[in-house]
Amino acid sequence: MKRDVRILLLGEAQVGKTSLILSLVGEEFPEEVPPRAEEITIPADVTPEKVPTHIVDYSEAEQTAEELQDEIQKASVVCVVYDVSEETTVEKIRTKWIPLVNGGTRRGPRVPIILVGNKSDLRPGGSMEAVLPIMSQFPEIETCVECSAKNLKNISELFYYAQKAVLHPTAPLYDPEAKQLRPACAQALTRIFRLSDQDMDQALSDQELNAFQTCCFGHPLAPQALEDVKLVVSRNVAGGVQDDRLTLDGFLFLNTLFIQRGRHETTWTILRRFGYSDSLELTPDYLFPALHVPPGCSAELNHHGYQFAQRMLEKHDQDRDGALSPAELESLFSVFPGPPWGPQLPRHRPHRGRSAAPARVPLPVDPGDLLGRPALSRAPWLPGLPHPLRAGLAGARHHSHQGEEAGPGKGQTQRNVLLCKVLGARGVGKSSFLRAFLGRGLGDARGPPEEPSVYAIDTVRVGGQEKYLILCEVAADSLLTAEADASCDVACLMFDSSDPGSFALCASVYKRHYMDGQIPCLFISSKADLPEGLSPPGLSPSEFCRRHRLPAPTLFSCAGPAEPSTAVFARLATMATFPHLVHGELHTTSFWLRVALGAVGAAVAAILSFSLYRVLVKSR
């Protein structure tokens, strides 16, 4: 909505433009009227719409044509004033003033126009019959107001309607020639209807209508008012009310009726409450809510956010199988202005779930959102949510102080979402590793083979706490450039034990990106069921890890009838959670011993602190 309104008064000489302005300001008819009034600014706190309003007069005797065009360009709305007792001034509206304001062209945005019939005290019958054909001819005319500067009749109403034409314009909402909502308006209202239809039965119950009413206007409808609304709809629209509930057709009819009766501010209130701008597009503030993350901190969804996401999944999971099919996903995202994830994410994302049907995925969540990295600040999946729930979800994102001011790898992380990059040469088994994370073997490759799964997400328990671990498959050769992004919470460097060259590639990536950093790394020897190949020149994998003070390579295989071991995934999550315990370790036992000792040390410290507290209390 515009932050200020600039009203320009035009019209023939002696029609009363200046008198109207002075009567508004002085609240009395001026005995002496100057040729032109100075520009007047009405403060925001004394206007009904709470916006500052500038009122500008025009005098053909004092201003040039160039000055007039400049004022028209700056005007938010133009009031064309005519004398109801002089028919020639009415005709000038059509032949002179409207073409002058909007250039006589039908292209581009048009300045809204208010027709003002002044001196109604001289013609009691009014002039509406003469003006109606003009209003029908020019759609930019918002309304016509008859008034009298002498009797102070409808003076305040005149400037109120001028404000309203700017702040709540009719043109984007309604086509007066077709007498129906414009497509963009109907589309926006349809989206709002779907968001308000919480039980997804294609109709708004009394409870949903009152929730919608409270969301938009701050209070519910009285029971009788609610019945009156449904009665009006049922009398005018076939199928507008079904089973005592308002359908989409009925909802659209109500808004059309508001506009036709001059109450388009009601429809604008609804649209703006759900994030729409004057051009009927979702505003940047709605699409990209501000999220400030202080240095040394990250942001994650708290349990309220996860509960909300779970409720959305359950709401759209029509067959109650614990997963969303493509059709159910389409239903969920039908109210979104665009895809909730970027092009880097596949269309089918594997995830452990109850459903065993192909091409079924859970409620998608962008790893960037979960991790609180830059993608989180863009909040790409918030725009489609209904306003009250959207606000609740935005509030569920909280700042989590990690004590990691020096970056990943320093101290224990308190985050619940961890990113592991699985790096390795093509063919070493990265995709199988991701499938094994989800409990799938080699014979259970879901999804089209031409669309490999880049991400896999599941929960892992670390020290009795549940963590979300995201595995991201990355081709190792893509990280051989210095500018490549290798950042993560833990790196999984995978090589084929039967292919010496695959280990050499992993070793190169380690030296380039991780050797001098603090990110914990774990080498994994895949296809451990196959015979080892020839030893590569130089250090063996075990010697390489010992030389660089890394944990010994972990053997992994997806072959065999049994599900692959999941211990390696718990280990990766633990390394990401306790990165300071990983570096300098030469074997697995030492690492897990430190984890255990850390937990025991914390418990001992707590007991000693409590004992000291009891001694101090007794001494008092």
Swiss-Prot record:
Broad EC category = hydrolase
The record's GO molecular-function terms, alphabetically, read: calcium ion binding; GTP binding; GTPase activity
Keyword Cell cycle, does the record have it? no
Q: Which locations, inside or outside the cell, does it occupy?
A: Mitochondrion outer membrane
Where does the record place the region Disordered? 340-364
Which spans are transmembrane here?
A: 595-617
Write out the residues that bind Ca(2+) 2: 317, 319, 321, 328
Entries under SUPFAM superfamilies matching the protein:
EF-hand, P-loop containing nucleoside triphosphate hydrolases
Q: Which residues lie on this side of the membrane: Cytoplasmic?
A: 1-594
Binding residues for Mg(2+) 2: 431, 473
Q: List the ranges whose topology is Mitochondrial intermembrane.
A: 618-620
User: Which modifications occur after translation, per UniProt?
Assistant: Ubiquitinated by PRKN in a PINK1-dependent manner, leading to its degradation.
The entry marks the following residues as binding GTP 2, namely: 427, 429-431, 527, 529, 558
Identify the CDD domains for this entry: Miro1 (cd01893), Miro2 (cd01892)
Q: Where is this cross-link: Glycyl lysine isopeptide (Lys-Gly) (interchain with G-Cter in ubiquitin)?
A: 96, 119, 164
Name the reaction it catalyses.
GTP + H2O = GDP + phosphate + H(+); ATP + H2O = ADP + phosphate + H(+); UTP + H2O = UDP + phosphate + H(+)
Quaternary state and partners of this protein? Homodimer. Interacts with the kinesin-binding proteins TRAK1/OIP106 and TRAK2/GRIF1, forming a link between mitochondria and the trafficking apparatus of the microtubules. Interacts with ARMCX3. Found in a complex with KIF5B, OGT, RHOT1 and TRAK1.
Q: What does the entry's free-text domain comment contain?
A: The Miro 2 domain is necessary for efficient ubiquitination by PRKN.
Q: Which family does it belong to?
A: Belongs to the mitochondrial Rho GTPase family.
Report the function annotation for this chain: Atypical mitochondrial nucleoside-triphosphatase (NTPase) involved in mitochondrial trafficking. Probably involved in control of anterograde transport of mitochondria and their subcellular distribution. Can hydrolyze GTP, ATP and UTP.
Spell out the protein name for this chain. Mitochondrial Rho GTPase 2
Species source reads Sus scrofa (Pig)
What is this protein's gene name?
RHOT2
